[in-house]
Amino acid sequence: MVEVALKGVTKRWGSFVGVRSIDLVIRDREFIVFLGPSGCGKTTTMRMIAGLEDPTEGDILIGGKVVNDLEPKDRDVAMVFQNYGLYPNLTVYENIRFPLKVRRVDTASHDARVRKAASMVELGDLLARRPKELSGGQRQRVALARAIVREPAVFLMDEPLSNLDAKLRVSTRAQIKNLQ
């Protein structure tokens, strides 16, 4: 993990200000949570860090480097969304492996990395299934494993526990904490 800094970050759409002048430093290995009502800018802030939204003003630094002009793929950020984003035609194994293929990671390491990530979120027995054969909680864990397998510099998670049952929330919280 690396330090993430937001310096005077603002996001506007016309006259509407979605995020107003955020100054924030998230230190290396620090775990933070954005709390607030719907529409207050939590997701927008994470999307700007990930490069999915451009800030209207201010700078975003990852590892001390301004990343405002970098494409999302070049920021070394993994983001887990509330709505999974799984590929329905791929197995759980293939969904987890997908980021490794896209980034052209040495194929010799794929199997071990996929199985380790799947094991971390208790999916080891489900690797041959397709998303339609999984519960909502299992799908969310596939999305989490897909982020874990990348070994990114920064993890962003937008309500990663929202579709999990109470028992899995407890264990998944511990697994997320272990990512630090």
What are these regions (language model features)?
Residues M1-T172, N178-L179:
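ABC family nucleotide-binding domain
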